[in-house]
């Protein structure tokens, strides 16, 4: 088993393994004649082939049929699965600590956990990304995603930190 941290943010997904390997990919997917391409390769073709590209699949992670049919993806979960497979392929028997944004809905988290299990990878824990990144003196944490930002208010009691509230700020993303 190789322990790794997988941080989910549709602007930049980060995978950091205990063996020192780090992988960063943007949340873009592109359908070509061989299958789904993700990350920077998909980002580079998004401008020339927008009808075959998607950058909303992490933000809108679901199993609803795509408006435009693609040969290798029925829904956003297929695109997320392809990207997870690509990212985790280099790690032998991954055991993941999953860092997710507060904006992830319960249904989306359920889909994500199922996708990771199908890769296959083992999940050893799930933590809110704001809690993982914040220092004890931080009261607010702003995570900027591709399509939105999430402002998380943190509460510190002694050595413990917890989330008191979070707010999604639509259209305040990188895109």
Report residues per predicted region.
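Gly/Thr-rich phosphate-binding beta-strand-loop-beta motif of the actin/hexokinase/Hsp70
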Residues: 1-25, 29-30, 135-166
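Conserved phosphate-binding loops in N-terminal lobes of ATP-dependent enzymes
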Residues: 12-99, 104-108
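Short clusters of small/polar residues that mark proteolytic maturation junctions
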Residues: 41-42, 165-168
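Glycine/Thr-rich phosphate-binding loops that ligate phosphate moieties of nucleotide
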Residues: 74-83, 115, 167-175
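Charged linear interaction tracts used for macromolecular binding and regulation
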Residues: 83-84, 117, 138-140
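Glycine-rich phosphate-binding loop and adjoining helix at the ATP-binding site
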Residues: 93-133
């Amino acid at each position: 088993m190789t322990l790794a941290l997988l941080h989910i943010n549709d602007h930049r997904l980060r995978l950091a393994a205990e063996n020192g390997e780090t992988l960063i990919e943007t949340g873009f997917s592109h359908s070509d004649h061989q299958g789904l391409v993700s990350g920077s390769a998909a980002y580079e073709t998004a401008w020339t082939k927008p009808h075959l590209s998607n950058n909303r699949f992490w933000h809108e992670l679901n199993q609803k049929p795509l408006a435009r049919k693609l040969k290798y993806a029925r829904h956003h979960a297929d695109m997320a699965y392809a990207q997870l497979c690509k990212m985790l392929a280099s790690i032998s028997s991954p055991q993941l600590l999953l860092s997710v944004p507060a904006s992830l809905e319960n249904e989306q988290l359920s889909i994500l956990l199922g996708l990771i299990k199908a890769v296959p990878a083992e999940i050893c824990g799930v933590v809110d990304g704001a809690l993982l990144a914040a220092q004890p003196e931080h009261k607010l944490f702003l995570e900027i995603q591709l399509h939105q930002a999430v402002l998380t208010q943190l509460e510190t009691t002694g050595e413990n930190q917890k989330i008191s509230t979070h707010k999604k700020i639509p259209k305040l993303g990188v895109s």
